[in-house]
Amino acid sequence: MLNSESDNGYKAQLYKRTNHGHVEFVYAFAGTDDWSDVVDDIDQYYGGSPNQYKMAVANAEILSSILKEKYGNNVDFAFVGHSLGGGEVAAASMATGFDAITFNPAAVTSDDLLGNPSHITNNIALGTKLFTIWGKDVYYGGDMLHNFQSNTNVDIPGAINYIQLGTGATHTIDDFYNYFYKDHDE
């Protein structure tokens, strides 16, 4: 496991596992957890290129190059992230061409971070649909970040997988964990 943490708030870890003789890597990015992250969220929303995003792309390019060199071009390598980390992994995927799986991601709006979004799958928490107005569905609960971004015409890159998490659903990664692992022991 490789851990990346910086003074600017960037946090990511590389995980490796061997599954039936096949080596797999996941580079996981942390979401917003302090005010410096919120500043980067706002900067990115308005088209800036925060240092965390630049660092995410630079590290992803270095790691993908090293892994390709060691394991070949078909290395099993993917990115995963939530919120701010979701935006960072989307940018990393567009820079490297490797798959990204996001959960309630921040949009990527900076032109110098955009690329081919075909390898990005975004998982968005939905609450309970209340009504539709002006062609937009209005939900109670669900991901407030995605609701804000879509209502201000800011699109997230890649495919979107809406997951009905129910009335109490929020922006947290815990909601997805509880959905996917309904029968887990606490």
Regions of interest found by a model, annotated:
Residues V80-G85, V89:
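Gly/Ala-rich beta-loop-alpha elbow adjacent to hydrolase catalytic centers
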Residues R17-E24, M94-E186:
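Serine hydrolase/lipase
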Residues M1-F79, A95-T96, A106-G115:
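A conserved cap/lid and substrate-binding interface adjacent to the catalytic center
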